[in-house]
Amino acid sequence: MPLLDSFKVDHTRMNAPAVRVAKTMRTPKGDNITVFDLRFCIPNKEILSPKGIHTLEHLFAGFMRDHLNSEQIEIIDISPMGCRTGFYMSLIGMPNEQQVANAWSASMQDILNVKNQAEIPELNEYQCGTYTEHSLEDAHNIARNILNRGVGINKNEDLLLDDNLLNS
């Protein structure tokens, strides 16, 4: 099985919160697709709570679109990582890391402005697979933590995993 790009970076050297360009590609029609690693937590040291990450999933995607989508950029998807240390964001376009960091910070402020569970979009049994598994309080704590720490930038060249460590 081929080694995925996300496993070619040294997770022990990742900073968080931080933005990283995980992958870029071009479609057959010539559109640029960029995948960003939005690392909320330091890998293997911190983790997002299940209810908090689920509530973020419902809120973050909409707020990021509000702050980042433009004539040149369109978010395709924002999905939580299985390891619960962040999200992957796929989009059409090539914003720089600082644009993404700014949108992320603005989105965290928007999350803090959500005052009650009833304001969480798609929070019902018809649109959510586990609609009872949410915590606005956890989402607020995560957002506050991101804003207090500030969003940095992780560069792939700084995180390249040594060949000797691959598959070890």
From Swiss-Prot:
<dbReference type="Pfam" id="PF02664">
    <property type="entry name" value="LuxS"/>
</dbReference>
<comment type="subunit">
    <text>Homodimer.</text>
</comment>
<protein>
    <recommendedName>
        <fullName>S-ribosylhomocysteine lyase</fullName>
        <ecNumber>4.4.1.21</ecNumber>
    </recommendedName>
</protein>
<dbReference type="InterPro" id="IPR003815">
    <property type="entry name" value="S-ribosylhomocysteinase"/>
</dbReference>
<feature type="binding site">
    <location>
        <position position="54"/>
    </location>
    <ligand>
        <name>Fe cation</name>
    </ligand>
</feature>
<keyword id="KW-0456">Lyase</keyword>
<dbReference type="GO" id="GO:0009372">
    <property type="term" value="P:quorum sensing"/>
</dbReference>
<dbReference type="InterPro" id="IPR011249">
    <property type="entry name" value="Metalloenz_LuxS/M16"/>
</dbReference>
<comment type="function">
    <text>Involved in the synthesis of autoinducer 2 (AI-2) which is secreted by bacteria and is used to communicate both the cell density and the metabolic potential of the environment. The regulation of gene expression in response to changes in cell density is called quorum sensing. Catalyzes the transformation of S-ribosylhomocysteine (RHC) to homocysteine (HC) and 4,5-dihydroxy-2,3-pentadione (DPD).</text>
</comment>
<feature type="binding site">
    <location>
        <position position="58"/>
    </location>
    <ligand>
        <name>Fe cation</name>
    </ligand>
</feature>
<dbReference type="GO" id="GO:0005506">
    <property type="term" value="F:iron ion binding"/>
</dbReference>
<dbReference type="GO" id="GO:0043768">
    <property type="term" value="F:S-ribosylhomocysteine lyase activity"/>
</dbReference>
<keyword id="KW-0479">Metal-binding</keyword>
<keyword id="KW-0408">Iron</keyword>
<comment type="similarity">
    <text>Belongs to the LuxS family.</text>
</comment>
<keyword id="KW-0071">Autoinducer synthesis</keyword>
<dbReference type="InterPro" id="IPR037005">
    <property type="entry name" value="LuxS_sf"/>
</dbReference>
<keyword id="KW-0673">Quorum sensing</keyword>
<feature type="binding site">
    <location>
        <position position="128"/>
    </location>
    <ligand>
        <name>Fe cation</name>
    </ligand>
</feature>
